[in-house]
């Protein structure tokens, strides 16, 4: 009996020591489990939103067939004949010194929605004695590629890096227009401080003083009223937005 009681006592003492040991180890075990949980990546959530698609102006954006371009692009002068058009890239009077490929006529095209908005800008300006002159609208992809080639030939990669020439332009979508204001009485362009296609900070919309600053703001305000957005590094450049834009390479004829 005494031996049995002694064994029970030893057994209880062992259990107590074992329990005490486990309790002392519990904080360490819990800490280890917490570290492991933090280090383990969460399981994929099938209901989570998909990653955001890349911007529309990427090389992955396919070029739409010419037949599609014909249905979506509109000649701005067919909607408002009083808008003046002087496509610089159809002539040698541009920074490359030669006409760009794809410019076969002095006609400015835009996506119809943008062309209609531009026509409204012209109509709003005329009571003020002002009108629009367009230097560029829709631009074939091949012309944009020719601009990039030119920067390589003349060793001016900075023009791409600094945002003055784009390798994939909203002009290719028919959703950008380069333009200025004219005085309807004289037919002359208003002073904007720099010529079109000036590749320097002087062409940044906010970098002007006196009459040039006033004229830049006149143009900007008139365009913004109809939904256009100015590119702040080029006082002449405005873009428009439509759902599901497409790139085009249809020649301008």
PLM features: residue spans?
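Short, positively charged and aromatic/hydrophobic N-terminal segments
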Residues: 19-20
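Positively charged n-region of N-terminal signal peptides that target proteins for export
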Residues: 23-26
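Extracytoplasmic cell-surface/polysaccharide-interacting catalytic and binding patches
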Residues: 38-137, 149-233, 241-253
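Conserved metal-phosphate-binding beta-hairpin within the catalytic cores
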Residues: 238
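Compositionally biased, low-complexity flexible segments
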Residues: 2, 6-7
């Amino acid at each position: 009996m005494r031996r049995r009681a002694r064994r029970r006592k030893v057994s209880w003492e062992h259990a107590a020591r074992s329990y005490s040991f486990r309790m002392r180890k519990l904080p360490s075990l819990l800490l280890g489990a917490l570290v492991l949980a933090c280090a383990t990546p969460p399981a994929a959530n099938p209901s989570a939103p998909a990653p955001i698609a890349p911007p529309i102006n990427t090389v992955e954006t396919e070029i739409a067939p010419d037949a599609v371009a014909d249905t979506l692009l509109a000649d701005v002068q067919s909607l408002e004949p009083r808008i003046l058009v002087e496509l610089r890239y159809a002539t040698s009077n541009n920074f490359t010194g030669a006409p760009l490929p794809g410019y076969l006529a002095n006609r400015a095209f835009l996506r119809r929605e943008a062309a209609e908005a531009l026509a409204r800008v012209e109509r709003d300006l005329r009571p003020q004695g002002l009108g629009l002159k367009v230097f560029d609208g829709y631009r074939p992809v091949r012309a944009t590629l020719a601009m990039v080639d030119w920067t390589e030939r003349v060793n001016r990669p900075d023009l791409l890096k600094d945002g003055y020439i784009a390798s994939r332009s909203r002009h290719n979508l028919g959703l950008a227009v380069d333009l200025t204001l004219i005085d309807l009485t004289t037919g002359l362009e208003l002073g904007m401080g720099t010529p079109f296609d000036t590749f320097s900070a002087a062409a940044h919309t906010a970098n002007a003083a006196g009459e040039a600053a006033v004229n830049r703001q006149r143009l900007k305000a008139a365009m913004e009223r109809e939904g256009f957005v100015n590119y702040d590094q080029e006082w002449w450049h405005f873009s428009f937005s439509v759902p599901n834009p497409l790139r085009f390479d249809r020649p301008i004829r």
